[in-house]
Amino acid sequence: MTTDHGLNINNLSMRFDLPNGGSVQALKNVNLHLKSGELMSVLGPSGCGKTTLLNIIAGFLAPTEGEIQLNGSTVTGPSAERGMVFQQGALFEWMSVRENVGFGPKMKGTPRGEIRETVDHLLDTVGLGDFKEKAVYELSGGMQQRVALARCLANGPDVILMDEPLGALDALTREKMQSLVLKLWKETGKTIILITHSVEEALLLGERLLVMAPRPGRIHREYRLPFADLGVDQDLREVKKHPEYAEKREEILSMIWDMEEEIMGRMEAQS
């Protein structure tokens, strides 16, 4: 893959050495290209390397083999070009909402007036304009994830990496956050990669959806889907009524179920 623009993952493999002298092949020969502005969800059974892949893209881990390039430059470590949103917001609880969102720009030496303007705009965008001076610990889980999204965007990343950011939320809050992610994707034009264990969420929040298989972690199948674009303008509950949604949901659930059964069979054979 030689395309300079976007995110390129080339022949990526990751092996973890174990204390007993053995090793675990977490990822093997992963190849992928994302154009700037694409929204991709990544799904698969536990142990398929989803989070490992995201951590390598973020620069938190160095791959055993292969490389990742963003806009033609090799990823060698963490960078403001790649923002991360975790399942738990990882916010500074002793700071106000405003201070959390403005922390990154402040560390970069951005002028105070520019920070205030950016923070105000982002908090209005995520629906927290009336909570700017609140302490983070006063907010609900869903509101904290909105702060985490705004804080990520404040750093101006080209790529937003989301590691199961909605997994701990109740159903109603989760649906509202899914709609917000789609809104931000369309308004900002950012490239977004979202890891999830939910087939439904992967379908709704991925114009491209990767299904990964385990042992070793690899890309098993890729789908191109219409639901994310539909969800920008429609209620997500209406999107779920789309006939192709039910068809793909059952297909992918069956695929992952078969993977889980295969894993259990291997474990029983080894015991």
Model-derived segments and their meaning:
Residues 66-78:
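Conserved ABC transporter NBD signature motif
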Residues 134-137, 155:
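Conserved signature/switch motifs of ABC ATPase nucleotide-binding domains
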Residues 113-131, 183:
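Conserved ABC ATPase "signature" region
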Residues 43-45:
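The feature captures the beta-strand-to-loop junction immediately N-terminal to the Walker
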Residues 98-106, 116, 120, 224:
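Short helical segment in ABC ATPase nucleotide-binding domains corresponding to the A-loop/adjacent helical element
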Residues 58:
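Helix-to-loop junction immediately C-terminal to a conserved catalytic motif
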Residues 160-163:
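Catalytic Walker B motif of ABC-type/P-loop ATPase nucleotide-binding domains
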Residues 149:
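Hydrophobic anchor residue at the start of the ABC signature
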